[in-house]
Regions:
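Bacterial N-terminal signal peptides that target proteins for export
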Residues: 1-9
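C-terminal, surface-exposed recognition/capping segments
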Residues: 29-84, 88, 92-94, 98-230
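Bacterial signal peptide processing site
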Residues: 23-25
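Low-complexity, intrinsically disordered short peptide segments enriched in small/polar/basic residues
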Residues: 9-11, 27, 167
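C-terminal motif of bacterial Sec signal peptides marking the signal peptidase cleavage site
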Residues: 18-21
Length: 230
């Protein structure tokens, strides 16, 4: 099956709940830990995952930072299938699966999680950092463990995710995404390191004023990268 045949398939998206709104700026000073020159927060999550306070390419929590296609480690001017590193001659050349959902789009290697050399967090921040897995973003937005509110930080819209266990929080700015020469605004799209059930798509976290959601998106889309560590 070629890439062009795929676009008749629908995007998977998981229903989200409505967030409370908040218009005031949140300029609180928070004492966070630091490793390899980057701050992180322990939200007391069951997995022990530690979330960075900034995106890759950003120096402040409210900055959007750089945008990365899935399994690419450097930002670029154009995000499209034509510029995607792992598509050659209309076939996927790495992270290719075959399943009941689809036939193969290339040579099957059954890799479903990013290798360190293809992980934007690892390459840019060091070996102790990774992009979150699909399970880790599920945990981050799980109402058992965190509260989520749409708010602003220094004039930038995004979501504040606060631990129910210890009251610590992270802010995810709504920096949009980049694709085919277009860009979106008012929504935050965040990479995971996990391939979807299609070789052409990967899981992501989406946040906006109406709620949050997670689903899958074409691998070539440029998205924000928020690293994690343990």
């Amino acid at each position: 099956m070629t890439v062009s045949k795929f676009f008749a398939l629908a995007t998977i998206f998981v229903a989200a709940f409505t967030l409370g709104s908040c218009s005031k700026d949140d300029d609180e000073e928070v004492n966070n830990s630091k490793a390899d020159g980057h701050e992180y927060v322990d939200l007391g999550l069951p997995s022990g995952t530690l979330w960075a306070t900034c995106n890759v390419g950003a120096s402040k929590p409210e900055e959007f930072g750089s945008y990365f296609a899935w399994a690419e480690t450097q930002p670029k001017e154009m995000y499209s299938w034509g510029t995607y590193k792992w598509l050659q001659d209309n076939e996927i050349t790495r992270y290719c699966i075959s399943s009941d959902f689809e036939s193969s789009y290339g040579t099957v290697d059954d890799k479903t999680e990013l290798l360190p050399e293809d992980d934007a967090a690892t390459v840019n921040w060091g070996n102790n950092w990774r992009l979150p897995s699909f399970e880790q973003i599920n945990e981050l937005v799980n109402g058992k463990y965190t509260n989520i509110e749409w708010t602003t930080l220094n004039g930038v819209s995004g979501v504040k995710i606060t631990s129910k266990k210890n009251g610590k929080s992270v802010f995810l700015p709504a920096g949009g995404d980049r694709y085919d020469g277009f860009s979106s605004e008012g929504v935050g799209y965040y990479l995971t390191r996990t391939l979807s059930i299609s070789s052409l798509r990967a899981y992501y976290l989406c946040v906006d004023s109406g709620g949050w959601g997670y689903g899958d998106i074409s691998r070539y889309f440029g998205q924000s990268a928020r690293p994690v560590r343990k």
